[in-house]
Amino acid sequence: MKFLDSAKIYIRSGDGGAGCLSFRREKFIEFGGPDGGDGGRGGDVVVECVGGLNTLIDYRYQQHFKAKTGVHGMGKNRAGGRGADAVLKVPVGTQILDEDGETMIADMTEAGQRLVLARGGNGGFGNAHFKSATNQAPRRVNPGQEGVERTVLLRLKLIADAGLVGLPNAGKSTFLATVSAARPKIADYPFTTLNPQLGVVGCDGREFVLADIPGLIEGAHEGIGLGDRFLGHVERCRVLLHLVGADTEHAGKAYKTVRRELEAYGGGLADKPEIVALSKVDSVDPDTLKQQAMRLKRAAKRAPLQLSAATNLNVQKALRAVLAEIDAAAVADAAGTAADAVVWAP
């Protein structure tokens, strides 16, 4: 399935049904009076968050959505039926923005979450509604209220517990394929990964979701390479696993390049907990490995993990470190929520 993380759609709720102009006509009833029913309400445009989706590709081929018009009122005081809703299904993690691209309407973060984007128009009154002591045979009816029309933007930010970042060819896809059932494309040339990939990782009887995003290069925040637009998919991650290939020219410079791009992107990415690992250690000789490890240690100001996804060296150690950071972030979030809670007192 092709990946698409943004879409512009045009929506319109249904018009209300018109009221009915009708009079009671029966044998032996000389003055039957008005019996026109009210029109039905127009359908709503509803966004529903569903599990099992991780792309907005459906909205590439259809951008216009309109709910059904309410049924018109009928004689014998019969009201019209309600118009059918237009339901838009989106993946978990979809943000709904106004046409300006900045005003947030909603953030769909849970499966089953529903939001009415455009409410249908009310149905018009039939002539029975206007009967009075001074007007026994009204010929007045209301048309249905018009529906609401608007343009909205959908932006998907995948929800993962941890994110893989690094330069192209740092071994991110190989790592994801080793620790999960995900099967990203793997090759020895840059930008093999063109779209974010998700994998469910098992570690010590527990599971978490790991996201692999396309590699960053210097100047990505200015649009060079694939740009930095995919960094939005790790905004929700609680921890970043930063892989630096041991076969790169200078591990320290490679690390600093990615850090500069994270800081330039903003969104709090540079402040997230980070685990630094020197990957592909099986691809270099011991002297080169020692030199690269020292360079990375000086740049990151901490001793990096040394791992190899191809030989499984220290892979479990890296996963346990990620899991520990996820747990620490969860505890911090819970403490923050408790601190913000208002204590009720009589």
Curated annotation (Swiss-Prot):
Any GO CC annotation of this UniProt entry: cytoplasm
A Pfam family the protein falls into: MMR_HSR1
Cofactor(s) of this protein: Mg(2+)
Keyword Protease carried by entry: no
MF (Gene Ontology): GTP binding; GTPase activity; magnesium ion binding
Obg domain segment(s): 1-159
Cell compartment(s), UniProt: Cytoplasm
Keyword Transmembrane helix set for record: no
Subunit (UniProt): Monomer.
Function of the protein: An essential GTPase which binds GTP, GDP and possibly (p)ppGpp with moderate affinity, with high nucleotide exchange rates and a fairly low GTP hydrolysis rate. Plays a role in control of the cell cycle, stress response, ribosome biogenesis and in those bacteria that undergo differentiation, in morphogenesis control.
HAMAP family the UniProt entry points to: GTPase_Obg
PANTHER family named among the record's database cross-references: DEVELOPMENTALLY REGULATED GTP-BINDING PROTEIN-RELATED, MITOCHONDRIAL RIBOSOME-ASSOCIATED GTPASE 2
Record-given protein name: GTPase Obg
Gene field: obg
